[in-house]
């Protein structure tokens, strides 16, 4: 019995029912607001123009479910010949999904701001850096708070944490979370990161060797089978069988080139999840080792895939009705959340016993949990913050690494330049015995490596949208013309403001050739951490507490993999490269890359 199909049909029926109910409610609400607006009570507000809610929502819904083909705009490449040779590739990186959702209304309205009325509540989308800087500033932490969780998933996952708290409660959580992510502690995390990435490299090498051995055995078996078949088949059939077998072997693994084909997003997700588990609660989820059995394993038993399911649930449109109607996926969702909570509680209990007898002669590997236990934080707050760390720490890092390796695989000149910089850095660290040790590696001294990371963060920011809710009436001063009051935006309290980091990073007014992957542009960019046009980790008082860790982790993983493997994009196996937005920006389909072992390794 195909239960998957039945489940999908059941879910769609719920969706249609809720959509009809929501549409009727929306019509009634709009009629009430139409009458209310006649009293002129809202005339004092000067909201930017935008599409109707129905038009906006249908556009979002169709793109979410891929119910229509995307319409790519033909980009003008007449000036490509005038661009720097360091641009490497003139391929525009405007993805289908982003062009039809994130960037669509900014482009159509030719404006940095537009508004949508969501059941009478104004939503303002902005890529205005002056407005975003104002809203995210430390002075406005209490005036502009995070919007409520409409899906109900985050409330269950991280209610008592730095992610969902506000005011004094947020300041309390921030104070206890800051210490584990200090520069000193992040440096102490490096050995765990190196150990885990080495485990992945060994895993890939072993898979490559095993595939080579299996293919050799298959070839021998095929030869034997062909000899037996000679009695019954003609020579042409035997030759066809040989060709088919050889083609299958070549598709699975290019033995002559020591190449293995992997879904890079899947591997990066498992890698970062194992790293986060070890650093946060001292728990090895062993996701990397389970990669061999992906086809045999039930997704319900894979903790990294459980988190993937949870993240997908957060952005499903039907989730907005979960407070009123039970959903079929609630059973699986709450099961996964309970299992994760049990793991964390077990880690808390076991770690409490260990830390009671800790002689403090060695650094603590479980940086987050140890710090929370030392500060006598309540168990529910520990669970909330650990969940936040697991969620944000592995998902954003995995997506960033996936985008980096994808871009490197499609821009060979950048990949070669990066490899040469890494080799040159190693030569500088060779010791007296003419040997290089990992302890000698300085992951902060490779400037070009940081350029690659920054450029990827610009094109694919982990958090593509930052939401804030105004607590009071306010006036937002537009950066286009601050001296013209007509361009300012008057907003009522409870206005939802969505800052499009993705659109800011792709704004042609701020970035030259914004859709071109060009790491060399960062050579002349200064004061990177204080720019209003580059905010991949947000900005102001609620800037991402783990950004230092994220950059250090990326430096190590990229360096290790590029030094060991040459990457290329597998056009035959991969679907078109598309992105979609859930809590983070993530690839829509698996991204298959060829990992060719370098000859000097």
Swiss-Prot record:
Q: Name one GO cellular component term.
A: membrane
Primary residence: membrane
UniProt cross-references to InterPro entries, sorted A to Z: Cyt_P450, Cyt_P450_CS, Cyt_P450_E_grp-I, Cyt_P450_sf, Insect_CytP450_Detox
Tell me where it resides: Membrane
Q: What class of enzyme is it?
A: oxidoreductase
Supply the alphabetized keyword list.
Heme, Iron, Membrane, Metal-binding, Monooxygenase, Oxidoreductase, Transmembrane, Transmembrane helix
Gene3D superfamilies noted in UniProt = Cytochrome P450 (1.10.630.10)
Please give one Gene Ontology molecular function term for this protein.
oxidoreductase activity, acting on paired donors, with incorporation or reduction of molecular oxygen
Q: Where does heme bind?
A: 544
Going by the entry's taxonomy, the superkingdom of the source organism is recorded as: Eukaryota
Which sequence ranges are marked TM in the entry? 12-32
The record's EC number reads 1.14.-.-
The cofactor named in the record is: heme
Membrane topology category: Single-pass membrane protein
Pfam families, from UniProt?
p450 (PF00067)
User: Which region ranges are annotated with the description Disordered?
Assistant: 205-253
Q: Does the keyword ATP-binding apply?
A: no
Similarity section: Belongs to the cytochrome P450 family.
The record's section on PANTHER family has: CYP9F3-RELATED, CYTOCHROME P450
What's the protein called, per UniProt?
Probable cytochrome P450 525A1
Upper lineage is: Eukaryota, Amoebozoa, Evosea, Eumycetozoa, Dictyostelia
